[in-house]
Design a protein with these regions (language model features):
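Flexible loop/hinge segments that line or gate small-molecule binding clefts
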Residues: 75-105, 109-112
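Amphipathic alpha-helix from the class-I
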Residues: 109-116, 156, 250
Length: 273
């Protein structure tokens, strides 16, 4: 189909498949990075964004994209989050990985670790705290308890490790959030933020960089966690994993995260108007 049509008949028959004409895709080899696939992935995302803007659909659920493929096609986006933020012209967005028993949001994501400190600002940390608070309040209907990780080992050990990022950037952002009435604790050492005891006490963890949160959430909820773009003027969820080209067409991929992404988007569509 060239245009999505939603009706009782199409719903009963299954989902409508919308084709986006792109470059010739006949030469695609499963499990291989190709620029033509990156181009197609971007075009399908842009089509979904277009349909959402005209209110033809209530939300967007994306499967993983291969960053190397979209770079090969000439697009500069390090991931979906940046593409969607640009297209919806939303300046304050962040990634949250969410499951019922664990959730974390990220101040920085797909950048080299040598660049993390360049992108770490008190304003950005405060924005992510606010976005996380508002999102969990919407999803769960309660005031969330948030835990903020430090950047350095032992959360800086009172300035002995790092360049006092905890003291100069993270703590002021936490204090700003508290003045707004948010329930925020931190900064704490990241190696204790995801213990069973901590997860019972807090609803979400604010992480300073990618692996600080992705490693624990994928160990605990790999097949259940959902990637949610916070701050968008539209609903967008996704899986919490990559393209897994190494097992393409083997039947080994676990669809659990995708199922949860669909469920969360559907539930949010009933709440967000």
């Amino acid at each position: 189909m060239s245009t999505p049509v939603v009706s009782a008949a199409t719903s009963a028959a299954g989902p409508a498949i919308v084709h986006c004409p792109t470059a010739d895709l006949r030469g695609i080899v499963p499990g291989r990075v190709q620029a033509s696939c990156g181009e197609a992935a971007i075009q399908y995302c842009l089509r979904a964004i277009s349909e959402t803007k005209r209110a033809a659909v209530d939300g967007i659920i994306t499967c993983p994209i291969n960053k190397e493929a979209i770079y090969s096609a000439g697009y500069p986006y390090p991931g979906h989050t940046e593409l969607f933020a640009e297209q919806f012209a939303d300046s304050k967005t962040c990634m949250m990985q969410y499951a019922s028993d664990i959730a974390c949001s990220f101040v920085t994501t797909h950048i080299g670790y040598a660049e993390v400190c360049q992108h770490l600002t008190g304003e950005r940390i405060a924005d992510v705290i606010e976005l996380t608070n508002d999102a969990l309040n919407l999803i769960r209907g309660t005031v969330p308890k948030l835990l903020v990780c430090g950047l350095n080992p032992h959360a800086g050990e009172n300035g002995r490790f790092g360049n006092r990022e905890e003291e100069l950037l993270i703590l002021p952002a936490i204090e700003k959030a508290r003045k707004r009435g948010f329930d925020v604790t931190g900064p704490v050492p990241a190696d204790t933020a995801f213990t069973p005891q901590s997860r019972k006490k807090f609803d979400a963890v604010i992480c300073m960089y990618h692996d600080q949160g992705h490693i624990p959430i994928k160990m605990i909820a790999f097949d259940r966690a959902v990637n949610v773009t916070l701050g968008l003027s539209a609903i967008r969820t996704s899986v919490d994993h990559g393209t897994a080209f190494d097992i393409a067409w083997t039947g080994k991929a676990d669809p659990g995260s995708l199922f949860q992404a669909v469920r969360l988007a559907a539930n949010l569509s009933k709440t967000v108007k």
